[in-house]
UniProtKB/Swiss-Prot annotation:
NCBIfam families: PRK05467.1-2, PRK05467.1-3, PRK05467.1-4. Binds 1 Fe(2+) ion per subunit. HAMAP family: Hydroxyl_YbiX. 2-oxoglutarate binds at residue 171. Its EC number is 1.14.11.-. GO terms for biological process: DNA damage response; intracellular iron ion homeostasis. Disulfide bonds: none annotated. This is PKHD-type hydroxylase Rpal_3968.
């Protein structure tokens, strides 16, 4: 399940992020990659332990956990502290095909998560750079994603994916992972579809409609059945 989430951050906040990030020191992105990923990764990152990365990351997590579409699709249990990367044409930056590590640990907080879902939050407008598409492969083929600044995409961490070479400008983004309360991807997808159907019925029939109430009960009971907390 691939879900695009518009306007996670407003344009004004994206501009503030970019101003702070443009003034920061960046490091080789391979410092946070696993052995296989490091062989195909060419980009820059904000130092993950820097005050700036941690501060901006907390703001992203706060925005996402208040976003109903994100909560519905992810059913998040733990969110890894967001990281920040930059792909510049001047550096020939790209990230070859790879799959994310199954478990991520943060040595500052001691947090360890199973990576169920990956998130990319775009911080550069599509017309600021050429190339840099996020290409995600699943059973239905390849999907190219290049969203407006402030928008995010959520996709299974089990997916093979890549970032195509940037040939003009710079692609700036935040990326991170989360552990869902619902481990099984198919169950999580059904929960998301059910929630969307319930919200559509609420709009049409009202929250007090007996069938809407019944379906809402089924939704919560399915989460109760599947959730790991």
């Amino acid at each position: 399940m691939l879900v695009c989430i518009p306007e996670v951050l407003p344009k004004s906040e994206v501009a503030e992020f970019r101003r702070l990030m443009d003034a920061a020191d960046w490091e080789d992105g391979r410092s946070t990659a696993g052995a296989q990923s490091a062989m195909v990764k060419r980009n820059e990152q904000l130092p993950p332990d820097s005050d700036l990365a941690r501060t901006l990351g907390r703001r992203i997590v706060s925005a996402l956990t208040g976003n109903p579409k994100f909560v519905s699709a992810a059913v998040p249990l733990q969110i890894f502290p967001p990281l920040f990367n930059r792909y510049a044409a001047s550096g020939g930056h790209h990230f070859g095909i790879h799959v994310d590590n199954a478990v991520r640990g943060d040595h500052l907080t001691g947090l360890r998560i199973r990576t169920d879902l990956s998130v990319t939050l775009f911080l550069a407008e599509p017309d600021e750079y050429d190339g840099g598409e996020l290409v995600i492969e699943d059973t239905y083929g390849s999907h190219e994603v290049k969203l407006a600044a402030g928008d995010a995409v959520l996709y299974p961490s089990t997916s093979l994916h890549m970032v195509t070479p940037v040939t003009r400008g710079a692609r700036v983004a935040s990326f991170f992972w989360l552990q869902s309360m619902i481990r099984d991807a198919q169950a999580r997808s059904m929960i998301y579809d059910l929630d969307n159907a319930i919200q559509a019925l609420v709009e049409r029939l009202g929250r007090d409609d007996p069938e809407t109430v019944k379906l809402t009960g089924i939704y919560h009971n399915l989460i109760r059945y599947w959730a790991e907390v």
